[in-house]
A protein has these predicted regions:
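Bacterial N-terminal signal peptides
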Residues: 13-24
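Lumenal/extracellular ectodomains and adaptor appendage modules
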Residues: 26-235, 564, 605
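Juxtacatalytic substrate-recognition/specificity segment
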Residues: 229-336
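Selective detector of the "anchor" transmembrane alpha-helix that sits immediately C-terminal
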Residues: 636-660
């Protein structure tokens, strides 16, 4: 349906002979079995926006269906024709005679005209008549069905002609520059005439008395800007309200509601202005019922890509507020229709209460309940729309009541910031990271459930099962319950360590099988961590931070498990080395250890382990082991060497002593005289 609802046209018998006259004598006249006269009309609706009227021209061909007899001749001189009740300035002309037209009666939104042909129409004869009248814009409420102005044309074009007689046609002529939409009909076109007029036309009509085409046309380039501003929280939003030049009432109405309503909506939602600094508001013929982010049928339509709000010229405060709420709840923030419509309606109602505006909210009816569906199955259009709008609002109210306004606003703040559920940040947990993980896209039914449960600490599983999910979705909720329980247990077991992002991403995308496998593997690593902690303490070692970094990082749980195995192996090596240290060394071993510093290697090994240098840990430990292992051999060799040395010293000393104690030999020197 285009524009305001049109009244249903009631078929009226529109051609009948008022008088059949017989002339002559003899046998009774042979009157046709059907109506004595047929009317075939070519009707042209010439739209004159500047004059606020439509000039209608009806070219009628009246044909007598009577037959003369030998003794009698028959003729007709008048007929009935139905036209819209709004027809004024009725005139009729013919090529001969003096035809006339008067209103015979009015009924069912139509005026029944009495056409006097101005001459006698003999049996089987035809006469062309031209009927003209005006359809004028009556003024009044903006949602009136008939509106003819330079900015907007809205009317219904009737088919005119005799019921049951085919061949009548309908044409609509619009001035250049208009963009038109056609409902019912059908009318084809437009065809551009030489003077620029746009022509829409019907095919020959088989039942003109029931034909009606709804036409709505505007001139997009005719909008006039009107600028202003409004504060939404801490932000200033520039308004550019673009209205038709001849519709100051719409501009004033929309400006008033938006100036007061945007701040109230921001407060109700709890999120600041999300789009660019300027909001363009455009007057249009009608609203659009569409995907997430558009208003309800006949409501405003928001385009997040360009920051434009289209509001129909008929809009009341409810439609204006609801359309403005989609500046938040649009495809940039949410991807599911029920979320956008339900929370937009909730914000509209709460803002209306704050502003003392009587808002019309979707209400659940018995008829709507007859079309109940899971909200995940709600598509655009169709018989379930009434249920969808009412159910979406009711669920939004239930969510707010269960979560509390503070938690709900926090969830929307997360959604607006692109903040994921399952954050690793927790200021009360030692070691928790400082920054939040962001980059999330528009919220769907799964993301919303995660965010709201995360902020409120309450379960919404029951509400989702009752209102949202299709039967095929229920298994996902079952898997989610189990995976979240395992996640909570793993988070608690891992503290103060933070689980790796990969497992949170799996939960965020509802890949519960993947998340479960990874969580189980992480639990195994946590068990390894505890074993490492106990073994390290027993060995006098301080566990390094390497395992935590790998555990929390992006290398994967396999890398963490490998690191844990390696650390445990190094601890085992170190423990074995400690076990090899002589506890009650013999004299030989004690002598072998003289001059060594195996404890320096042990200290160095402990320091290397704490620093995460596992190779150095093993190297220093093995060095200490080597000292202890060789101590007995070294001691033995040292004893032998010492004994040998001692024996040599003893011998040397004996020799020295013996030499000193031996008697001195007397030396006799003889002098010899030399003979000369």
């Amino acid at each position: 349906m285009i524009g305001p609802n049109r009244g249903r046209r009631v078929p009226i018998v529109i051609a009948a002979v008022l008088a059949v006259v017989a002339v002559g004598f003899g046998a009774r006249g042979a009157v046709a079995a059907g109506p004595p006269v047929t009317l075939v009309a070519a009707t042209t609706y010439d739209v004159l926006p500047d004059e606020h009227r439509i000039a209608v021209t009806v070219k009628v061909t009246a044909t007598s269906t009577l037959k003369d007899t030998i003794t009698r001749r028959f003729y007709v001189d008048r007929a009935y024709l139905a036209v819209p009740a709004s027809a004024t300035n009725l005139r009729i002309s013919a090529t001969s005679g003096k035809p006339s037209v008067t209103v015979s009666s009015r009924a069912a939104g139509a005026a029944v005209l009495l056409l006097r042909c101005g001459s006698q129409l003999g049996a089987g004869k035809s006469i062309p008549l031209t009927l003209t009248f005006d359809i004028a814009d009556p003024g009044g409420a903006p949602d009136r069905a008939l509106r003819i102005s330079p900015s907007l044309v809205m009317f219904s074009a009737w088919g005119i002609g005799a019921t049951g007689v085919s061949g009548s046609t309908v044409r609509v002529r619009l001035p250049a520059g208009y963009s038109a939409s056609i409902g019912r009909g059908p009318l084809t076109g437009p065809v551009t005439e030489s003077d620029g007029h746009l022509v829409y036309a019907s095919a020959p009509l088989s039942t003109p008395g029931t034909f009606v085409a709804d036409l709505a046309a505007d001139r997009p380039g005719l909008l006039v800007d009107g600028r202003g501003s409004v504060s939404v929280g801490a932000q200033t939003v520039m308004l550019n309200i673009r209205a038709w030049p001849d519709d100051p009432d719409w501009r004033a109405r929309v400006s008033d509601v938006l100036t007061r309503g945007l701040p109230a909506l921001g407060s109700a939602i709890g999120v600041g202005w999300l789009i660019g600094p300027t909001l363009e508001v455009r007057e249009t013929i009608s609203g659009t019922a569409g995907e997430a982010g558009t208003g309800s049928a006949g409501g405003g339509s928001f385009d997040a890509a360009v920051g434009r709000l289209d509001i129909p010229y008929t809009a009341d405060p409810t439609i204006i507020l609801h359309g403005a709420a989609h500046a938040w709840f649009n495809a940039a923030l949410v991807s599911d229709r029920w979320i956008a419509e339900g929370f937009a309606a909730l914000a509209t109602a709460e803002a209306g209460t704050a502003l003392s505006i009587a808002v019309r909210s979707p209400a659940m009816t018995v008829e709507a309940l007859g079309h109940s569906i899971p909200l995940n199955a709600w598509a655009v259009g169709g018989p379930d729309d009434d249920f969808g709008y009412a159910a979406a609002l009711q669920l939004a109210r239930n969510i707010e009541a269960r979560a509390g306004i503070t938690a709900l606003r926090a969830a929307w703040a997360d959604a607006a910031a692109g903040t994921f559920a399952y954050q690793p940040t927790d200021p009360l947990v030692e070691g928790s990271v400082d920054t939040q993980e962001q980059g999330a896209g528009p919220v769907d039914w799964r993301t919303l459930l995660d965010l709201i449960e995360g902020q409120s600490g309450r379960s919404f599983d029951g509400l989702w099962r009752a209102w949202v999910v299709r039967p095929s979705d229920a298994a996902l909720l079952d898997a989610r319950v189990d995976a979240r329980a395992l996640y909570a247990a793993t988070v608690e077991a891992a503290a103060p360590w933070v689980l790796p992002r990969s497992v949170r991403d799996a939960l965020r995308t509802w890949q519960f099988d993947t998340a479960t496998v990874e969580l189980q593997d992480l639990m195994s690593v946590i068990d390894q961590r505890e074993s490492i902690t106990r073994a390290a303490a027993a060995a006098g070692l301080s566990p390094p931070t390497a395992l935590r970094h790998v555990f929390e990082g992006t290398a994967g749980v396999g890398a963490a498990a490998a690191e844990a195995v390696t650390e445990q192996a190094v601890i085992d090596v170190f423990s074995d080395v400690l076990a090899a240290e002589p506890t009650d060394p013999s004299l030989v071993i004690t002598i072998g250890l003289l001059g060594t510093d195996s404890q320096a290697d042990i200290v160095a090994a402990r320091e290397a382990f704490a620093a995460g240098d596992l190779d150095a840990t093993v190297s220093h430990a093995q060095a200490a082991r080597a000292v202890w292992a060789s101590a007995e051999d070294v001691g033995g060799r040292r004893i032998i060497s010492g004994a040998t040395l001692a024996f040599a010293v003893v011998v040397l000393l004996w020799l020295l002593v013996h030499r000193r104690r031996a008697p001195k030999r007397k030396i006799v020197r003889h002098a010899h005289r030399l003979e000369e």
